[in-house]
């Protein structure tokens, strides 16, 4: 743009954090395959020729072409004018539809989530190594992942590896006592991928000792158990939810073309019925130029597909 407009352009990026987290690497951080710093990049280092503002977007006024933000320690509202706007607000987590899930499930959205999950798994192993109660030990050594998308598949594989590597330090835990379960409500995992690749992933996970349950959802959960839609009661102290994505609250109240809370764009990423607004990432419904095997007409909201 600077070349085309001969430097008569000002670009500003607004983000809640001053760093970028590559979410597909969070399972590796949780599993210890990579360090946290490998999944994080400072925005000012990545993008040096634009203005970066650490702030939270509150609302967008299309008529007046302004964005209202909260910034600073006192979170004072500020109104920013724009000529052109790119919306990349991603998605939020909403686990409230399933009783108990919001209160008891771990998630995989942020760097802190990955660190928390790793610490939680180690704590469960520590507890299982010393307890004399069989039921408590069973719950501590049962790890349940909900969701068979990219995040769920990567997470379940990484935590299984972490547990397997750690067992040599816990003499009172046998490998046969470990149970790692993946629950997927659909009839297959990795719906974003061709069926052949999904089947390959399933076989790999099964060989590593992961138990996959398809066509199975969650009815409710507590801090000590999970009840599936088939009626099975799983004694578990670890529930990891990679489901429950919901639209950004900012987009929900923005009067613009949407489908299930995601912004409708054309193949140039321009928002429908607008001239100066674009949208990218999780919050956009992006049409595909070609339809690969087993895919819908729209691109899945995953970084892997974008790359």
Region locations from a protein language model:
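Beta1-alpha1 glycine-rich phosphate/pyrophosphate-binding loop at the start
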Residues: 1-59, 143-144, 150-193
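FAD-site-proximal beta/loop scaffold in flavoenzymes
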Residues: 103-133, 224-225, 233-307
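A Rossmann-like FAD-binding core segment of flavoenzymes
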Residues: 52-66, 160-267, 271-273
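Hydrophobic/aromatic beta-strand patches that form the interior of the parallel beta-sheet core
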Residues: 12-14, 53, 86, 106, ...
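FAD-binding core/adjacent interface of flavoenzyme oxidoreductases
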Residues: 51-144, 162, 240
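Short glycine-rich anion-binding loops that position phosphate/pyrophosphate groups of nucleotides
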Residues: 90-93, 156, 245-247
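Short, well-ordered coil/turn residues at beta-beta hairpins
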Residues: 70, 88-89, 216, 229, ...
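Short acidic/His/Gly/Ser-rich catalytic and metal-binding motifs that mark active-site loops
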Residues: 20-23, 94-97, 249, 286-290
């Amino acid at each position: 743009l600077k070349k085309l407009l001969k430097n008569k352009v000002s670009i500003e990026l607004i983000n809640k954090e001053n760093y970028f987290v590559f979410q597909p690497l969070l399972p590796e951080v949780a599993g210890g395959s990579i360090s946290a710093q490998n999944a994080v990049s400072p925005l000012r280092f990545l993008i040096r020729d634009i203005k970066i503002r650490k702030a939270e977007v509150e609302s967008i006024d299309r008529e007046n072409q302004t964005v209202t933000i909260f910034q600073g320690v006192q979170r004072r509202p500020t109104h920013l004018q724009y000529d052109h706007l790119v919306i990349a607000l991603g998605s939020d987590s909403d686990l409230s539809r399933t009783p108990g899930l919001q209160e008891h499930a771990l998630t995989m959205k942020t760097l802190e989530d990955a660190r928390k999950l790793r610490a939680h798994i180690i704590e469960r192993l520590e507890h299982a190594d010393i307890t004399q109660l069989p039921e408590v030990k069973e719950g501590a050594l049962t790890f349940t992942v909900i969701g068979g998308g990219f995040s769920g598949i990567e997470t379940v594989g990484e935590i299984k590896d972490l547990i397997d590597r750690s067992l040599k330090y816990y003499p009172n835990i046998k490998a046969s006592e470990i149970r790692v379960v993946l629950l997927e409500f659909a009839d297959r995992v990795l719906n974003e991928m061709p069926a052949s690749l999904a089947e390959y992933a399933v076989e790999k996970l099964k060989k590593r000792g992961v138990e996959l349950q398809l066509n199975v959802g969650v009815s409710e959960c507590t801090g000590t158990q999970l009840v599936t839609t088939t009626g099975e009661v799983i004694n578990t102290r670890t529930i990891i939810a990679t489901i429950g994505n919901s639209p950004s609250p900012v987009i929900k109240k923005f009067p613009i073309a949407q489908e299930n809370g995601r912004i409708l764009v054309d193949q140039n990423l321009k928002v429908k019925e607008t001239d100066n607004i674009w949208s990218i990432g999780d919050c956009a419904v992006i049409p595909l130029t070609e339809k690969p095997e087993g895919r819908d007409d729209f691109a899945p909201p995953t970084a892997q597909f974008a790359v």
